[in-house]
């Protein structure tokens, strides 16, 4: 019997991640696709924030944001990021580290078009991470954008996706008496495959 049967069974970490997320969608109170995204600034100081993961592809994880935000500037400078997804209802988590590239083509256009009208207008109105005088100033900008853009605003150039291509994916499941189960998939770039290792809790 394989040491990885059950929750950790299979050799494709992206498929395991999709299965876990599907389970969390049935059990979490809200936002099962929320991730704590970590980046570093120019001085090496870390930054973290919650964002929503929008897709698990065959070889990458995708989220969307404002390209003028602090997170985007830090990603552009380092080309790397990490994140953790944690589900209290399942007592499981996934940790990912990897390289980041932009997704600002048709896929980003399609996702932007799928958002609610108010969310699309909000993306245009928000100068993310910049100082804001007041909430009323923000709402005034939303009203102005609404009048300018009409009912079908296109994706702004300063807004789009990022694709995290992992070098490492760790799956963690709670165990009794802190004897948790942990397996890490590490990318072998020379052979384009994964080395799978059980880790001590």
From Swiss-Prot:
Residues involved in substrate binding:
54, 111, 115, 119, 178-180
Q: In which pathway does it act?
A: Cofactor metabolism; pyridoxal 5'-phosphate salvage; pyridoxal 5'-phosphate from pyridoxamine 5'-phosphate: step 1/1; Cofactor metabolism; pyridoxal 5'-phosphate salvage; pyridoxal 5'-phosphate from pyridoxine 5'-phosphate: step 1/1
| Gene Ontology MF: a single term | FMN binding
InterPro entries the record matches: Pyridox_Oxase, Pyridox_Oxase_CS, Pyridox_Oxase_N, Pyridoxamine_oxidase_dimer_C, Split_barrel_FMN-bd
**Organism's domain of life?**
Bacteria
Question: A biological process (GO) annotation for this entry?
Answer: pyridoxine biosynthetic process
What EC number(s) would the UniProt record show?
A: 1.4.3.5
Q: Signal sequence span per UniProt?
A: none
Keywords assigned: Flavoprotein, FMN, Oxidoreductase, Pyridoxine biosynthesis
Q: Pfam families given for it?
A: PNP_phzG_C, PNPOx_N
Q: How does the cofactor attach, per the note? A: Binds 1 FMN per subunit.
- What cofactor does its activity depend on? FMN
PROSITE patterns assigned: PYRIDOX_OXIDASE (PS01064)
Detail which positions bind FMN: 49-54, 64-65, 71, 93, 128-129, 172, 182
Enzyme class per UniProt: oxidoreductase
Catalysed transformations (reactions): pyridoxamine 5'-phosphate + O2 + H2O = pyridoxal 5'-phosphate + H2O2 + NH4(+); pyridoxine 5'-phosphate + O2 = pyridoxal 5'-phosphate + H2O2
Describe, as the record does, how this protein assembles with itself and its partners.
Homodimer.
* PANTHER family in the cross-refs: PYRIDOXINE-5'-PHOSPHATE OXIDASE, PYRIDOXINE-5-PHOSPHATE OXIDASE
Q: Any idea what job this protein has? A: Catalyzes the oxidation of either pyridoxine 5'-phosphate (PNP) or pyridoxamine 5'-phosphate (PMP) into pyridoxal 5'-phosphate (PLP).
UniProt record similarity statement: Belongs to the pyridoxamine 5'-phosphate oxidase family.
Q: What is this protein called?
A: Pyridoxine/pyridoxamine 5'-phosphate oxidase
Source species of the chain: Ruegeria sp. (strain TM1040)
Gene that encodes the chain? pdxH
């Amino acid at each position: 019997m394989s040491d990885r049967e059950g929750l950790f069974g299979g050799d494709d970490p992206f498929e395991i991640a999709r299965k876990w997320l599907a389970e969390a969608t049935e059990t979490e109170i809200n936002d099962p696709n929320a991730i704590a995204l970590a980046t570093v600034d120019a001085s090496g100081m870390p930054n973290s924030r919650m964002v929503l993961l929008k897709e698990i592809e065959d070889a990458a994880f995708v989220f969307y944001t404002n390209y003028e935000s602090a997170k985007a500037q830090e990603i552009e400078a380092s080309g790397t990021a990490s994140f953790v997804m944690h589900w209290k209802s399942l007592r499981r988590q996934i940790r990912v580290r990897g390289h980041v590239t932009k997704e600002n083509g048709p896929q980003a256009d399609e996702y932007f078009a799928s958002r609610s009208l108010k969310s699309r207008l909000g993306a245009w109105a928000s100068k993310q991470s910049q100082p804001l005088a007041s909430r009323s100033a923000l709402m005034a900008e939303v009203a102005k954008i609404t009048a300018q853009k009409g009912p079908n605003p296109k994706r702004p150039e300063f807004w789009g996706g990022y694709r995290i291509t992992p070098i490492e994916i760790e799956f963690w499941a709670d165990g009794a008496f802190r004897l948790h189960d942990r397996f890490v998939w590490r990318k072998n770039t020379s052979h384009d495959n994964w080395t799978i290792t059980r880790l001590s809790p």
